[in-house]
Amino acid sequence: MNIPTLDDLNFSNSKVLVRIDINSPVDSKTGKLLDDSRIKAHVETIRELVSRGNGVVLVSHQGRPGDNDFTDLEEHSRLLQKHLDMEVEFVGDVMGPYARERIRNMKLGSVLLLDNVRFVSEELIEASPLQHSRSFLVRRLQPLFQGYVNDAFATAHRSQASLVGFPLVLRSSAGRVMEKEVSALAKVFNEGEEPKVFIMGGGKVLDSLRIIENLVKRRLADRILTGGLIAELFAVAKGLDLGKDNLQVLEKAGVLSLVPRARKLLLSGAPVEIPVDFKVEKGGQVYEEPANKVTAVIKDVGSTTVGIYSSFIRDAKIIVMRGPMGVIEDERFRESSRTLLKNSLESPGYLIVGGGHMISLLGGIGPLDSSKVHVSTGGGALLLFLAGERLPALEALDISAREVLKK
Ligand SMILES: Nc1ncnc2c1ncn2[C@@H]1O[C@H](COP(=O)(O)OP(=O)(O)O)[C@@H](O)[C@H]1O
Ligand SMILES: O=C(OP(=O)(O)O)[C@H](O)COP(=O)(O)O
């Protein structure tokens, strides 16, 4: 693939639309952002574009409709302003008359943040770059810009309008985050030794299952240590009775229908490990139970599991960690993810850690040795990239290089 970078396009004194990913963990009680790592990550790209006299218009999503973390981007704009140390105008609109008026009238050298792009229904459709290039989002915004930059590595696995539509109609390049992630990950992973251990948790069960299927098919993982909801799915697939409450959680997440796929993976001999115990909560009380005797709602993996997983980590040459083991928004269920992260950092292997929730746990850990760890902004995108899948956002930039830049 031929992905143009900012060095290739050299945007200057232009209006540039920049797709970033500042989707961040949200405290479900207060609605406040719990971490600003992804916001900080984009500062370099934005500063560089501003320093070349460009008017920078930022577009991002936050959460998914119906979820607790589906919010507007006002708080994000304040944090971005703090990290950039310059004014960021928050526009509470994405593509309507107000947004277009603010973009038309903005000064070169200034920064403007549009609202959550998933407020626009077209953004929620997975479609081809060509289809998205004809969306209202692209048709309304494209005439206001001379260029498009995609810096949203963490969403590069989605084929959504703001990611794949613009490269077909604007001169486009990758931003610095996108560029660095792609080159660092390809190098580390391809040149890395075995065993490769993947630690996978979190709430996005369908994504995780797809990734595990890919890893298994390509024989890229020596061990896959599961936590979070994906561990519960595999536990059910293995025939463990997790009780009515936990089945309800899986049903509510719409993932029970994935049990046969998980079962097929287990039967095919996939190296998937499931927890031997869990931390559960009942009536405000927290305690540990063996995986075959669960009587309450699972909130984290148990301490025996952490011990076993840690022994696999110690022997690994490459450790990839994505998605927390438990409901880390609650301090009582943060410990196992934090311990596994610490043990991974202390082990002799190289660590690649990614995803909004996992990187939020790095905060209290102190300075990291960049020769031993790569912190990725991506979670699902990171793993799909490592598993060798083609990421639609990168493909769209590749098409752009061939079809738009050559014209
Ligand atoms: N056992 C569990 N039950 C319910 N939710 C869980 C469980 N374990 C983890 N989670 C949730 O998973 C979410 C993080 O998952 P995800 O978004 O996939 O990770 P990341 O942002 O790191 O890629 C958190 O909100 C956390 O509360
Ligand atoms: O947080 C993200 O992905 P991740 O949870 O895999 O790290 C990205 O912002 C993508 O969000 P999405 O999975 O709702 O498309």
Swiss-Prot record:
**Could you say which enzyme class this protein belongs to?**
transferase
Could you say which residues bind substrate here?
D21, I22, N23, R38, H61, Q62, G63, R64, R118, R158
Which InterPro entries does the UniProt entry name for this protein? Phosphoglycerate_kinase, Phosphoglycerate_kinase_CS, Phosphoglycerate_kinase_N, Phosphoglycerate_kinase_sf
Q: Which residues form the signal peptide?
A: none
Q: Where does ATP bind?
A: E329, G355, G356, H357, M358
* GO molecular function list: ADP binding; ATP binding; phosphoglycerate kinase activity
Listed pathway(s): Carbohydrate degradation; glycolysis; pyruvate from D-glyceraldehyde 3-phosphate: step 2/5
Q: What is its EC number?
A: 2.7.2.3
Output the Gene3D superfamilies linked to this UniProt entry. Phosphoglycerate kinase, N-terminal domain (3.40.50.1260)
The listed locations are: Cytoplasm
Biological processes, Gene Ontology terms: gluconeogenesis; glycolytic process
Q: What is this protein called?
A: Phosphoglycerate kinase
Lineage, broadest ranks: Archaea, Thermoproteota, Thermoprotei, Sulfolobales, Sulfolobaceae
- Originating gene: pgk
